[in-house]
Amino acid sequence: MMMMALMKVILCLWLTVTGVSASYVPQEMNKTIQNLLQHYKIPLVERFNGNPVFPKDSMDGNVEMKMIFMHGVLETYEDLIGHMLKQLPTASPPLGSNQDKPASPGTSNDDAAPVKADVRSKLMYILEKIQFLKTHRYQEQEKLLHRLQNLKKIQMDNRTVQSKALWELPQLFEKASSLADNTMRRRRRRQARNRMRLKA
């Protein structure tokens, strides 16, 4: 009980320090995460070792870059939770077979099945929330990432592909240079406006 209270205090402190607004995180989702953390316990020293799974500085940049990165984060969470679900036992053992396996300390095999089912349902709930957010708020990023992944599928050994790619290069090189130049100009104008505001 004391450990649960301590975990809640630490989570609140972490949300405050990192500047995360919990207004988008439904209360039920927050509660579900807290319950899952009881199942996936690690020492506090490991949780706060200074090496987050998703480094904070990766979220720097303009809005478009942040959106693309956050799409990748949501996709990674989808994969991670899918992996966590696969690690859970799929079905309880047939009757009579629990005599063969020793119960874990403090629980019987009969007690473990509902706990695993509860963990599974909670993980499924979190997965659905992530998938909903990704599907409804990150569609453009999804399309862009699929287009980027398709670039990796280009047949490098194909002579036709090589020739066509060379033919298309001047036009694409022009677009890439112009895009980078326009972005740099916009950044300089923004910096100049900010300097003017500071002087005023």
Swiss-Prot record:
<dbReference type="InterPro" id="IPR009079">
    <property type="entry name" value="4_helix_cytokine-like_core"/>
</dbReference>
<feature type="glycosylation site" description="N-linked (GlcNAc...) asparagine">
    <location>
        <position position="30"/>
    </location>
</feature>
<protein>
    <recommendedName>
        <fullName>Interferon gamma 1</fullName>
    </recommendedName>
</protein>
<dbReference type="GO" id="GO:0005615">
    <property type="term" value="C:extracellular space"/>
</dbReference>
<feature type="region of interest" description="Disordered">
    <location>
        <begin position="91"/>
        <end position="114"/>
    </location>
</feature>
<comment type="similarity">
    <text>Belongs to the type II (or gamma) interferon family.</text>
</comment>
<feature type="compositionally biased region" description="Polar residues">
    <location>
        <begin position="95"/>
        <end position="110"/>
    </location>
</feature>
<keyword id="KW-0325">Glycoprotein</keyword>
<dbReference type="GO" id="GO:0005125">
    <property type="term" value="F:cytokine activity"/>
</dbReference>
<comment type="function">
    <text>Probable cytokine.</text>
</comment>
<keyword id="KW-0732">Signal</keyword>
<dbReference type="GO" id="GO:0005133">
    <property type="term" value="F:type II interferon receptor binding"/>
</dbReference>
<feature type="glycosylation site" description="N-linked (GlcNAc...) asparagine">
    <location>
        <position position="158"/>
    </location>
</feature>
<feature type="signal peptide">
    <location>
        <begin position="1"/>
        <end position="22"/>
    </location>
</feature>
<dbReference type="GO" id="GO:0006955">
    <property type="term" value="P:immune response"/>
</dbReference>
<dbReference type="InterPro" id="IPR002069">
    <property type="entry name" value="Interferon_gamma"/>
</dbReference>
<keyword id="KW-0202">Cytokine</keyword>
<keyword id="KW-0964">Secreted</keyword>
